[in-house]
């Protein structure tokens, strides 16, 4: 394919930024908005679940989820996400991006509602059905990662492609914030409608029966934004790169893009045949010798950096409520009633999202096509390492009265540089550097490696952060939060080293980056 490029792809690469680009960002981005809401809202209600289903009124403190239950509730959706990323990533290359794009959204809507309707006669029954539905919710969420990234990368022009993909991913920040806002509104409403004493002042009375509705409403509310965008997902045409390069129908690709870009594109039939013929010998498969030679190092880079990043990112996100409790930013559980605790946790998460998480995403949108992917990812990992060390080394200082605000500010900066850094770039790069016929699959593999890291973070941090001298009930002694933060700092440092393998794709077409236009014999003589 070295002898030319299809006109429709050249037109896409040089198209001016226009209304349809922004529509694509919103349509794909609302999926990520819902993904983040559904994945992280569980951290807002897990303490409430412990109070409702595991409280022993003879105890001095309200109930909490047992270790194995807490790990399952927090981590099962991540297991589903990993499976969904692999399956839908592969399916997106086999059947087309659009063909399976709507199904992931339907699965998310159905399972989100079902999660809120979890049932059972015992605590174990409720938790079991909740975990079942959250696994399949995660499965649908997993499909959104490779499909949304691939669709946006294949629609975008090469000048602002990074910003467009980053903007889709940035909707994750608004999803996290929206989850906190929903929890604030719901808990405030129930708190005012059904006042209750703290656990210390009235153990049984601190948990009103209506509190069972709180967590269910919060879990189900994520269906709203997903359902609103389903129609528009179904209206999107298949990407031109899939239609032209994989389905080998350049004429249809030109017709589809002519409609959405308001530009008349006439694809030359002879050119299309020549390009197709040129690519016929370039159809090596995943993990073939040619793939390993061209993209083996790239796959190591995108999987390892995403894996290392998500260990830290999901540890921080899913268990920030526990960290804030231990440093004293959230009062002890026994001094609050059940609904008040949800309100306090949601308020803390909203502040972190507003001050650290969301700004970081949009700094990436602003600078990704200026500084480049490599520089932002390297800088992000480096700064996360620095701030993690800044939290861990003087940890005892941060836990003393009067220093909690400083801890929260430092903690917020780790989120800022995660999102103005590797949390965004690990999503962007795999959507750019692999050939069209393997793009969705390789993005799915990279994302699944990330979710493997998230599972390590979700299950590992819960146990590792336990106080070595005074672990919580049901837990074995761990290494403590201070040492756990040191481990996360080391994880970020390893991510910085692995970033050295990541190629730069700024300002290049997808075909130039992936060398899809270069045959094996041409590459060998280059």
From Swiss-Prot:
Induction: Not induced in roots by phosphate starvation. Residues 43-70, 121-124, 185-211, 316-349, 395-407, 466-483 are extracellular. InterPro entries: MFS_dom, MFS_sugar_transport-like, MFS_trans_sf, Phos_permease. Belongs to the major facilitator superfamily. Phosphate:H(+) symporter (TC 2.A.1.9) family. The keyword Magnesium does not apply. Residues 1-21, 92-99, 146-163, 233-294, 371-373, 429-444, 505-526 are cytoplasmic. Its main location: membrane. It comes from Oryza sativa subsp. japonica (Rice). It is a multi-pass membrane protein. GO terms for biological process: phosphate ion transport. One of its GO terms (molecular function) is symporter activity. NCBIfam families: 2A0109 (TIGR00887). High-affinity transporter for external inorganic phosphate. One of its GO terms (cellular component) is membrane. This is Probable inorganic phosphate transporter 1-3.
């Amino acid at each position: 394919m070295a002898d030319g490029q299809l006109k429709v792809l050249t037109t896409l690469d040089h198209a001016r930024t226009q209304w349809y680009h922004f529509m694509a960002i919103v349509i794909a981005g609302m999926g990520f908005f819902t993904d983040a809401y559904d994945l992280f809202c569980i951290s807002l209600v897990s303490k409430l679940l412990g109070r409702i289903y595991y409280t022993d009124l003879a105890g001095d403190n309200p109930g909490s989820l047992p270790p194995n239950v807490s790990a399952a509730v927090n981590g099962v959706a991540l297991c589903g996400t990993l499976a969904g990323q692999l399956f839908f990533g592969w399916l997106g290359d086999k059947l087309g991006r659009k063909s399976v794009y709507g199904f992931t959204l339907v699965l998310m809507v159905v399972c989100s509602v079902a999660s809120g309707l979890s049932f059972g006669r015992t605590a174990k029954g409720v938790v079991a059905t909740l975990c079942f539905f959250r696994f399949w919710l995660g499965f649908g969420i997993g499909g959104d990662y490779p499909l949304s990234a691939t669709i946006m990368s294949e629609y975008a022009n090469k000048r602002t492609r990074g910003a467009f993909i980053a903007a889709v991913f940035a909707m994750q920040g608004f999803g996290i914030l929206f989850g906190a806002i929903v929890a604030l509104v719901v808990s405030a409403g129930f708190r005012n409608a059904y006042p209750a004493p703290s656990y210390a002042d009235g153990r049984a009375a601190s948990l009103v029966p209506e509190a069972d509705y709180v967590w269910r409403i919060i879990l189900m509310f994520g269906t709203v934004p997903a359902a609103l965008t389903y129609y528009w997902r179904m209206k999107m045409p298949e990407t031109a790169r899939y239609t032209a390069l994989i389905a080998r129908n350049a004429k249809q690709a030109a017709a589809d893009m002519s409609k959405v870009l308001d530009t008349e594109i006439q694809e030359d039939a002879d050119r299309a045949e020549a390009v197709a013929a040129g690519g016929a010998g370039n159809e090596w498969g995943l993990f073939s010798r040619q793939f390993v030679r061209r993209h083996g190092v790239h796959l190591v880079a995108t999987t390892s950096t995403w894996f290392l990043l998500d260990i830290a990112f999901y540890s921080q996100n899913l268990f920030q409520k526990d960290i804030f409790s231990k440093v004293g930013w959230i009062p002890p559980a026994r001094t609050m009633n059940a609904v008040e605790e949800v309100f306090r946790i949601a308020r803390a998460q909203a502040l972190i999202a507003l001050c650290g998480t969301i700004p970081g995403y949009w700094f990436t949108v602003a600078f990704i096509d200026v500084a480049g992917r490599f520089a932002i990812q390297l800088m992000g990992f480096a700064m996360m390492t620095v701030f993690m060390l800044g939290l861990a080394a003087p940890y005892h200082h941060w836990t003393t009265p009067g220093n909690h605000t400083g801890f929260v500010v430092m903690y917020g900066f780790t989120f800022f540089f995660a999102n103005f850094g590797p949390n965004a770039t690990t999503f962007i790069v795999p959507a750019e550097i692999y050939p069209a016929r393997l793009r969705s699959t390789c993005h799915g593999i990279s994302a699944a490696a990330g979710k493997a890291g998230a599972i390590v973070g979700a299950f590992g941090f819960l146990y590792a952060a336990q106080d070595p001298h005074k672990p919580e009930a049901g837990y074995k002694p761990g290494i403590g939060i201070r040492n756990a933060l040191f481990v996360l700092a080391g994880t970020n440092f390893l991510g910085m080293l692995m970033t050295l393998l990541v190629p730069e794709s700024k300002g290049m077409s997808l075909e130039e980056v992936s060398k899809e236009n270069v045959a094996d014999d041409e590459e060998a003589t280059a």
